């Protein structure tokens, strides 16, 4: 019932635990669903080894942010989920804030880790936990869209810093190449996400 890469519980365990809590009738129960920002671009630029390190860092951040009785699982490739038993919405919201804060100050990785989060709470017996999970997931995707521009910019800057550190050329030269690539990209009518990718490639 454990994920080999992160050591967290896997999705099967998460779903079994949901069923058990549902049957017990315990509430409030809060659910957090998270999706790692920048995993694909990290894999593309630095390889899957660096992407794995990002996933492991997020797992450690979740463990540090949550409490002993919370159930933390790797839900999918870049998704994580947390069950917070007997936890109201406000307490769960503060845990989400803690996750964000630790991500922002995390120093043990080449890139800055970040994760989009969604939260919902079962507050009475008329609610089903599967619906709470769905609502938390929907909120996560909405938050990811709202945050995507700023978070992607942060990921790009973080990756650029790493590229500069790994490069034998001067940072000034790399910045000139990036500036020229951006001008060319705009002349070609590239979209913002394509310009971001071009910016990273120009720094290689």
Predicted regions and their residues:
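Acidic/His-rich, divalent-metal-binding segments that scaffold phosphate/diphosphate chemistry
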Residues: 136-204
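Active-site-flanking beta-strand signature of metal-NTP-handling nucleotidyl enzymes
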Residues: 30-35, 72, 156-161
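Conserved long alpha-helical elements within nucleotide-processing catalytic cores of c-di-GMP signaling
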Residues: 1, 7-30, 37-67, 73-77, ...
């Amino acid at each position: 019932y454990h994920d080999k890469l992160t050591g967290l519980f896997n999705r099967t365990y998460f779903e079994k635990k949901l069923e058990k809590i549902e049957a017990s009738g315990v509430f409030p129960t809060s659910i957090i669903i998270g999706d790692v920002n920048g995993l694909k671009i990290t894999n593309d630029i630095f390889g899957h080894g660096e992407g794995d390190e990002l996933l492991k860092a997020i797992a450690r951040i979740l463990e540090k942010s949550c409490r002993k009785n919370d159930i933390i699982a790797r839900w999918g490739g870049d998704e994580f989920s947390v069950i917070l038993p007997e936890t109201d919405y406000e307490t769960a919201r503060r845990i989400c804030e803690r996750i964000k804060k630790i991500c922002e100050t995390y120093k043990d990785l080449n890139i800055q880790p970040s994760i989009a989060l969604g939260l919902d709470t079962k507050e009475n017996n008329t609610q089903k936990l599967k619906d709470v999970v769905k609502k938390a997931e929907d909120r996560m995707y909405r938050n990811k869209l709202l945050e995507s521009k700023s978070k992607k910019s942060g990921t790009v800057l973080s990756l650029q810093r790493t590229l500069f550190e790994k490069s034998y050329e001067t940072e000034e030269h790399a910045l000139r190449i990036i500036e020229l690539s951006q001008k060319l990209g705009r002349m070609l009518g590239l979209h913002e996400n394509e310009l971001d990718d071009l910016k990273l490639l120009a720094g290689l």
